[in-house]
């Protein structure tokens, strides 16, 4: 187990990628504190993992929720080694022209208070504990932190902001605390919800046929599941393997950034080459 006796805090840990991270970290020997708004989801975590999990109901938009979670984490487990900012919402690729003028302020504030301020507040609350443990921070970014069309103007702008935060916080907090990010693409099993301000709060990404949409776009030829993406988080959370690693964002998106203009990949060339028996 690669995270034996490590203590981790995950925001948005009750569903989708967040739940997959919690499950994987517990399996790797970690003890995990979770901050989430879902009472039912928190109860499911307690039932699944027992004393390995501390579950706190709260809202990432408020510093007090983060402070309460950090305090309960340290009180229960004695320390905090890694903070994972993961809670977020999506705009379902709503273009600026599609956002009504009378909803733009509300939609902007909702997006940035959750997807940007929520991360910053979490780190602020965890600073003392992470300094004491010489710990680390991991942010869930997105392919939208690097490229257009992974969301609309609100989501893409927010994720670009997180890339900047990774770099700035790595500078400000080093050498005591490492700060890195992981930028997944679309994930199977994701429960990412939309903006309430755009009437998308009850829409779940799990209902969108992303797999069919992405299979011909990604160089890998398939969309990753949430569970398949957790290995990157384990890697960044380990101490022995990542001593010099800070200020980095790992593209974990199926190769979106290397697809060609007209084809997602040219693996057909290998198929043709080997089918002719050129190499065995």
Swiss-Prot record:
- Biological process according to GO: catabolic process
Where substrate binds, per the record, is at 142
Q: Which domain of life is it from?
A: Bacteria
User: What PROSITE patterns does the annotation carry?
Assistant: ADH_SHORT
Query: Its Gene Ontology molecular function terms?
Result: cis-2,3-dihydrobiphenyl-2,3-diol dehydrogenase activity; oxidoreductase activity, acting on the CH-OH group of donors, NAD or NADP as acceptor
Q: In which pathway does it act?
A: Xenobiotic degradation; biphenyl degradation; 2-hydroxy-2,4-pentadienoate and benzoate from biphenyl: step 2/4
Task: Give the EC number(s) listed in the UniProt record.
Answer: 1.3.1.56
Active site (record annotation): 155
Other observations noted: Has a 50-fold preference for NAD over NADP.
Kindly provide the name given to this protein in its UniProt entry. Answer: Cis-2,3-dihydrobiphenyl-2,3-diol dehydrogenase
- Organism placement in taxonomy: Bacteria, Bacillati, Actinomycetota, Actinomycetes, Mycobacteriales
């Amino acid at each position: 187990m690669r995270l034996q006796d490590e203590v981790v805090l995950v925001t948005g840990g009750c569903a989708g990628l967040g739940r997959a991270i919690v499950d994987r970290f517990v399996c790797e020997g970690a003890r995990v504190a979770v901050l989430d708004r879902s009472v039912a989801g928190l109860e499911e975590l307690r039932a699944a993992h027992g004393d390995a999990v501390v579950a706190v109901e709260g809202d990432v938009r408020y510093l007090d929720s983060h402070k309460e979670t950090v305090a309960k984490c340290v009180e229960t487990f004695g320390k905090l080694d890694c903070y994972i900012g993961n809670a977020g919402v999506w705009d379902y690729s709503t273009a600026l022209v599609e956002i009504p003028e009378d909803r733009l302020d509300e939609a902007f504030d909702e997006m940035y208070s959750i997807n940007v301020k929520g991360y910053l507040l979490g780190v602020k609350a965890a600073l003392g504990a992470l300094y004491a443990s010489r710990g680390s921070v991991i942010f869930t970014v997105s392919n939208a932190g690097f490229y257009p069309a992974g969301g609309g103007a609100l989501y893409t702008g927010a994720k670009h902001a997180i890339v900047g935060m990774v770099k700035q916080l790595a500078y400000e907090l080093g050498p005591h605390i490492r700060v890195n990010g992981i930028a997944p693409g679309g994930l199977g099993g994701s429960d990412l919800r939309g903006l309430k301000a755009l009437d998308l709060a009850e829409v779940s990404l799990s209902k969108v046929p992303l797999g069919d949409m992405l299979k011909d776009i990604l160089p890998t030829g398939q969309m990753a599941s949430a569970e398949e993406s957790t290995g990157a988080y384990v890697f960044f959370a380990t101490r022995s393997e990542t001593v010099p690693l800070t200020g980095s964002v790992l593209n974990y998106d199926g190769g979106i950034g290397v697809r060609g203009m007209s084809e997602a990949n040219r693996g057909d060339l290998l198929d043709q080459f080997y089918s002719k028996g050129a190499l065995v």
